């Protein structure tokens, strides 16, 4: 899980979602998991 000031899709399988008011990226590739914070 990377915590970054701005999250971006890295590949076409990445999805940007909002969870508990946080913007997150989830993906099949676990290296692409990101959270904004």
From Swiss-Prot:
It comes from the Bacteria. One of its GO terms (cellular component) is ribosome. GO terms for molecular function: structural constituent of ribosome. GO terms for biological process: translation. Keywords: Ribonucleoprotein, Ribosomal protein. Belongs to the bacterial ribosomal protein bL36 family. This is Large ribosomal subunit protein bL36. The gene is rpmJ.
